[in-house]
Amino acid sequence: AMTVAPFLRHGPEGAALPLVLDSPHSGEHYPDDFDHVPPRAMVRRAEDTHVARLYRGATRVGATLIEATFPRAYIDANRSLVDLDPSMLADDWPDAVTPSRKTEQGIGLVWRIARGGTPLYNRKLSAAEVQRRIDRWYLPYHAALATEIDTLHRAFGAVWHINCHSM
């Protein structure tokens, strides 16, 4: 199977500006282990579809765009790592969790429900599989974003970061 990178980096065309855009919710690659129960079309309603495409034009004026490739319902790059619902897990999570209102609504770090309230899973997730999602998708995305911001900050002394969404 083809290995999909956790993010796409769209670099500036021409001279760089200290401007980083990221699109954490436009990912359309559904990993093989995302065994959601509702139909794909329903799960896809969580996506900020086409947001990354809308902002790609910013690279023409010197911005850098980091785009998530994975779906937010699988692992949400715009949530804190502690924003986890322990009731979704079959076993204990090794770290402290601080579920937010988003998690209470079923849309935390790992989504419990699809848009409209349909449960995503007919099983509990293992702590190990959630950790794999974090390691394989979430952390590399955030590392790429941090690298971009740090590099431009060093070069320019300041940097602007715009987190891009469809609402």
Segments from the language model and where they lie:
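A glycine-rich, aromatic-flanked flexible loop/lid motif
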Residues: 163-167
